[in-house]
Amino acid sequence: ILYWVQEYHIDGFRFDLMGLYDVDTMNQIRRELDSLPDGRSILMYGEPWAAEPPQMRRGAVPADKSHVRLLSDRIAIFNDDTRACIKGSVFDMHSTGYINGAWYQETAVRHSFTGWAGPYSPVKLPTQTISYASAHDNFTLWDKLIYAEHKDPHGFDFPDPDCLASNKIAAAIVLLSQGIPFMQAGEEFGRTKRGDGNSYRSPSRINRLEWSRIGLFAELTEYYRGLIQIRHTFRPFRCATGKSIRRMVFSRISEPQMIAFTLPGEAEDPWRMAAVILNASEETRAVALASWEDEPLPKQWDVVADAQHAGVTALRTIENDHITVGSRSILVLADVR
């Protein structure tokens, strides 16, 4: 590993089935990388599970999800709890997540927004969490949505409105959460494998990226682009220290499938405060926001993301005392300085 860094300038390592390695080995790799010039900028993450029970020396502890508390806080893991709460189990094509009906996943989605870090969590810092909704294994996000929404299983090439709405909410959870966001290539244009959930054995016509879908799914592609711009613009969305988690305030909402939080900015941020509101229900709903240490909320907000568009340019303004969110949609609000 050190040779690859020094000779080939590799700046990141992903460990497949990291649970087959032991904690001591992984932590030693991290220490050795950190000792190099600029070594602390090298990314290190992996899958915190093993396909089979690991063969280790007596007393060794596997570097898996159940032992994340023993790993360096500079080693990140794919958080499959985030993946499951967003879209449902990857092992059941018809199971649903928060984005399409599983209201009981609200608490897990809140944890996802915090990167699963906190004083009572084995995750020390949000940057230990890789937030994602899909990867190379299992169904693509779009195919999973088609199946879970009980759509035509052959309609993978149709930008179904319900699936588009669910996909946008999934993207918002991943890209506006604390931690490290991860996307499967092509997720932003509804990548499909024609319903193949185990495509390592499949031909190129299944696994290829169909670039023509960028035109077909232009609305979704631009939505991902806009959410990335929002994350880049407002630094508290990508805080590495945990400060944002402590200042993030969730609203108390009695209706199911609604989540809302505010997050204050720093003095150098272009926004004094941001708010994220999700409504995965089938009804338009109103919400009252709360703030950190009762910091005054603005009288008006700029809407920078809604059901159709996302970005850093204001789409319109709304009054703080009259915030409504359409069914199966999100709002991202900004208090611009």
Segments (PLM) and residue ranges:
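Conserved alpha/beta catalytic core and glycan-binding cleft of carbohydrate-active enzymes
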Residues: 30-31, 40-189, 198-200, 253, ...
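Active-site neighborhood of glycoside hydrolase catalytic domains
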Residues: 1-55
